[in-house]
């Protein structure tokens, strides 16, 4: 992991949605579930319905949906 990916407190910008998902997976596998759920607000991920990169809110690290589906 490079320096920007190690900053889990909001300032890190990960280059692609794929890189971010990989980083989140690594955190979850290493037992940092709470870190992921509490700090990854407004990061990019894939909406399962639209199949493209969208924003997701805190607590949706495992099941991201875009804002259009959150109502």
Curated annotation (Swiss-Prot):
Belongs to the varicellovirus ORF57 protein family. This is Uncharacterized protein 57.
């Amino acid at each position: 992991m490079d320096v920007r990916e190690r900053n889990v407190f909001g300032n890190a910008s990960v280059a692609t949605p794929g890189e971010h998902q990989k980083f989140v997976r690594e955190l979850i596998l290493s037992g940092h579930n709470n870190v992921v759920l509490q700090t990854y607000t407004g990061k990019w991920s894939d909406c399962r319905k639209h199949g493209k990169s969208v924003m997701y809110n805190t607590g949706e690290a495992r099941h991201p949906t875009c804002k259009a589906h959150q109502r």
